[in-house]
Amino acid sequence: MKLLNKIYSLIIIVGFFYHYALAEKLPFSVGERLEYSAKFNFIPAGKAFLTVVSIDTVNNLPAYHVRYEAQTGPIADKIYKIRDNVDSWLDEKEFFTHQQTKNIREGKYRFTSHSQIMYDHSIAIVNKDTIPIQGRLYDPYSLFYYFRTLDLISGKTMDLTVFDNKSLTEFQMIITSKEQVLVPAGTFDCMVVRPFREGKTLQKNEGDMTIWFSNDAYKMPVQIILKIKYGTMVMKLKTFNL
């Protein structure tokens, strides 16, 4: 019994230091919250947030729970009300998507979904539909975090499969340039990432995105341009709690 207790204690200690070491290497951690000013079709509209909520267990594996929120303010609400909430659960080691819930409200448009990706069975379950898959999948919102774990080198390209609702699309991700960006949070030297596929867009029926990541240890998404249902959302970093 004493031996079993020692083994159990050792497992706990090793697990603790493993998670600690992993967290030390990452440019973000649980509790990080990035706040953005948001413009819709270049009109000041409201605010958006990216939050690392927790580390949960999904499909018997540890996963980062991250959340994207966007909302218009009182004036913009009268013109085109936006209340978008997307929760994604990303693999703790490689940041591909395990699970996602979406609750989208943009004007009169409404959309909700729950997606569970079962890699062991090579399927994705979206609401009540089952979709065959191959390899690792990334949802568009996971890219805000996945790219932060990589060396962002100008001219570098990467291929991956993007999962959005029931759509699976192969995309080439391109780090196009270095740019200096002025946002409410300050001035940042950034690497610019443009996911694309010729003739296709990153988000089905919505549009493309461009992300400016700070060229420092944190690689924060300083500026984001998203094509949403009926226009363009421009997000600029306002405050950050790392």
Predicted features by range, described:
Residues 4-16:
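Sec-dependent N-terminal signal peptides
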Residues 22-117, 152-242:
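Acidic, serine/threonine-rich low-complexity disordered tracts
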Residues 106-150:
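Hydrophobic, well-structured mid-protein blocks that either form specific transmembrane helices
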